Amino acid sequence: MKVEAKKKFGQNFISDQNLINKIVSILGNDKDQLIIEIGPGTGALTKLLAQKYNKVVAIEIDTDMEPILKKEITNDNFELFLSDVLLVDFEKLIKEKRQHENQKVSIISNMPYYITSEILFRTLNVSDKLTKAVFMMQKEVAIRVCSYKGENNYNNLSVACEFYADKKYEFTVPKHMFYPVPKVDSAIISLTFNNKYTEQIKDKDKFLTFLRKIFNNRRKTILNNLSNVTNDKTKANEILDNLNIDKSLRPEVVGLEDFIRIYNKTR
C-alpha cells in the first residue's frame, strides 16, 4: 500500500519483499523474542516480524499510520504504541511488554536520518536489556558506526558502539529501493550486545560524555583533547605518561581499550 511520505518525520518506505526478508533474518530464528520496532510506517517489516516472533511492539509518531497498521497487521501478538520515540522510556517499556524474564529483546528500525544518533544512544542506554539491534541508516553514518581505530570515519560513535556491542556492517541498500527516493544510499548494521567492556566502567553515561569531548577536535592530539576534559594539562600529561600512551597521537588512532584506561585514570 503506497501512502504519501511526510518529510517532517523523515519517512522513506520500503516494499521489496526480498529486502524485507533479508533485514528481518538478521534478528535470527529464535521465535521467543520481544521485538521493538521504531517507526513501522506502513508495516512492511512489521507484518513479517509479527509472523515470526512471539511479541512485537511498534513505536510510531505518525498517527495517520494507525489505521493502515491495524488493517495490515491483525496478529494478537502485535501492539502499536503511538508516540515520539525520543519520549519513550525504553526500560519501562521492556519491563511491561516482556512476556517472561528470560525472553530476549531486540530492536529494529528503518531510522529517520534526522534522529539516528539519538536513537542509537537511547538504545545503548538499555543495552543490558537487549540481545540485538538491527538498524537501517544513512550509509555514511553506518560506515562511521562500524569503523575501528585508524579508519577515516572513526569517531566517538564508533567507540561507543564498540563499547557495548559486536558491530557489523551488514549490507548496503541502494536509494532506489525506497519511496520516495532519498538523496543518498542507506545501509543495514547490526549490534549484538555483550558485557565484554561495560563492566570496566561504573558510570557509562559519563564515559560517553568523555568520548564526545575527546573527539571534540579531531585535529588536536590526544594530550590536547584530554587536557580539555580534565581542565588540567599537567594531569593529562601524567595520565598518558603513566599509561605509556603516545601524547602526539590523535584520537582516531586510539582504540577502545586505551580510552577505557584513560577514562578510569580521570576518575
Curated annotation (Swiss-Prot):
Compartmental location: Cytoplasm
Keyword field contains Cytoplasm: yes
EC number of the protein: 2.1.1.182
Source organism, top-level taxon: Bacteria
Family membership: Belongs to the class I-like SAM-binding methyltransferase superfamily. rRNA adenine N(6)-methyltransferase family. RsmA subfamily.
Positions of S-adenosyl-L-methionine binding: N12, I14, G39, E60, D84, N110
HAMAP family the record matches: 16SrRNA_methyltr_A
MF terms in GO: 16S rRNA (adenine(1518)-N(6)/adenine(1519)-N(6))-dimethyltransferase activity; RNA binding
Entry keywords, A to Z: Cytoplasm, Methyltransferase, RNA-binding, rRNA processing, S-adenosyl-L-methionine, Transferase
Pfam family, one: RrnaAD
Catalytic activity of the protein: adenosine(1518)/adenosine(1519) in 16S rRNA + 4 S-adenosyl-L-methionine = N(6)-dimethyladenosine(1518)/N(6)-dimethyladenosine(1519) in 16S rRNA + 4 S-adenosyl-L-homocysteine + 4 H(+)
Gene: rsmA
Keyword rRNA processing: yes
Function: Specifically dimethylates two adjacent adenosines (A1518 and A1519) in the loop of a conserved hairpin near the 3'-end of 16S rRNA in the 30S particle. May play a critical role in biogenesis of 30S subunits.
One GO location term (cellular component): cytosol
Listed InterPro entries: KsgA/Erm, rRNA_Ade_diMease-like_C, rRNA_Ade_Mease_Trfase_CS, rRNA_Ade_methylase_Trfase_N, rRNA_adenine_dimethylase, SAM-dependent_MTases_sf
Name by which UniProt lists this protein: Ribosomal RNA small subunit methyltransferase A
